[in-house]
Design a protein with these regions (language model features):
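Membrane-interfacial entry segments at the cytosolic side of transmembrane helices
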Residues: 114-123, 204-210, 247-262
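TM-adjacent membrane-interface loops and short helices in multi-pass inner/ER membrane proteins
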Residues: 292-305
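Structural signal for the C-terminal ends of transmembrane alpha-helices
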Residues: 47-60, 106-116, 194-203, 237-248
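Alpha-helical transmembrane segments of multi-pass inner-membrane proteins
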Residues: 121-224, 228-243
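Transmembrane alpha-helical segments and their membrane-water interfaces
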Residues: 85-139
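Transmembrane signal-anchor hairpin modules in multi-pass inner-membrane enzymes, especially those
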Residues: 1-79, 115
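Membrane-embedded alpha-helical segments of multi-pass membrane proteins
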Residues: 37-53, 94-103, 183-191, 230-237
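A membrane-periplasm/extracellular boundary helix in multi-pass inner-membrane enzymes
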Residues: 133, 137-142, 240-286
């Protein structure tokens, strides 16, 4: 392969990785702009371009680098088209699963772990910035909530379909570019953890890292996601624990791990026993805001198969 072509493709790999992570985590925002058909075309073109860059950069996919358990699950998902009662929808879902899985393989092979995390962070930073910009634009210049672009001419837009609710200056909850507060909060949490890990490890760029931490915390506050709040407490506790045990000896680590597992099991037991009190503190109902109803409906649908 031409060395010049290979080196250029190598330089484009991080951009390809950012595009994949962006579409994977913020695809709803792209879909809100271009609609389902436009989103499908954009995703297909981006995925094709990324694979071309992947091969031109000299990367190769070998069977030994593909997880047997994951690939078996993907095959099972695709085979479910055979016995599904909704074959068209299941076939579309199978195609999406294959596309998503191929993108994951591309990213996993193309980058070492540290570089992959940096590429991931770049994509999540774009999502966070776009979310703030979009929320500000709607609150300052539009003055009312907006639906996805392809729904602008609908006579009636369902309540849950609105993209931005113009709630930034009312304290939230905001939905950002992704159009859903829970995924947006999850993105902010992942970015926060990555920034903290790199900040602790590298100990540089203090002002920049502090700004990103503030941006992520702002998203977490404005989204008000109870699920992500719990995940944040668990993640930060795990991060602090790992930072502590890295300075301990072998036997001290074993003891610390046992203490941590015991504490985690105790907290979990208390949370289960005092479920009503815990959900009340989080400002949610005992079935976590209708999730019991959702699962009941899903079980009804599963009975049709």
């Amino acid at each position: 392969m031409n060395t010049t072509v290979s080196s250029r493709a190598e330089s484009l790999l991080p951009i390809a990785g950012v595009a994949i992570f962006f579409l994977a985590f913020a695809g709803q925002g792209v879909r809100n702009i271009f609609g389902w058909l436009g989103f499908g075309i954009i995703t297909a073109l981006v995925l094709l371009a990324c694979w071309v860059v992947f091969f031109l950069a000299g990367r190769r996919v070998t069977l030994r680098r593909i997880s047997l358990s994951v690939s078996s699950f993907i095959v099972l998902c695709c085979l479910s088209v055979i016995w599904s009662q909704y074959r068209l929808e299941t076939f579309a879902s199978a195609l999406i699963t294959l596309a998503t899985s191929s993108a994951g393989i591309l990213v996993a092979i193309a980058f070492p772990l540290r570089q992959m995390l940096k590429v991931f962070m770049d994509a999540m930073k774009i999502v966070v910035v776009l979310s703030y910009v979009l929320e500000l634009w709607v609150s300052l210049f539009v003055g009312h909530r907006i639906p996805p672009m392809y729904m602008r001419h609908w006579k009636e837009v369902p309540e849950l379909y609105y993209w931005i609710n113009d709630s930034l200056f009312r304290g939230g909850p905001i939905q950002g570019f992704v159009g859903n507060r829970n995924p947006l909060a999850f993105i902010a949490l992942l970015l926060l953890l990555c920034v903290l890990v790199f900040w602790i490890q590298d100990r540089n760029q203090h002002i920049r890292n502090l700004l990103w931490v503030c941006a992520c915390v702002g998203i977490l506050i404005l989204t008000g996601s109870a699920t992500v709040f719990v995940a944040m407490l668990v993640s930060l506790s795990a991060l602090v624990f790992l930072l502590i045990i890295r300075h301990l000896g072998f036997y001290e680590r074993r003891f610390a791990v046992r203490v941590a597992l015991t504490a985690a099991a105790s907290f979990l037991l208390v949370a289960v026993v005092m479920k009503d009190q815990v959900t009340e503190i989080l400002g949610r109902s005992s079935d976590m805001t209708g999730r019991g109803v959702i699962w009941a409906k899903l079980l009804e649908l599963s009975a049709e198969h």
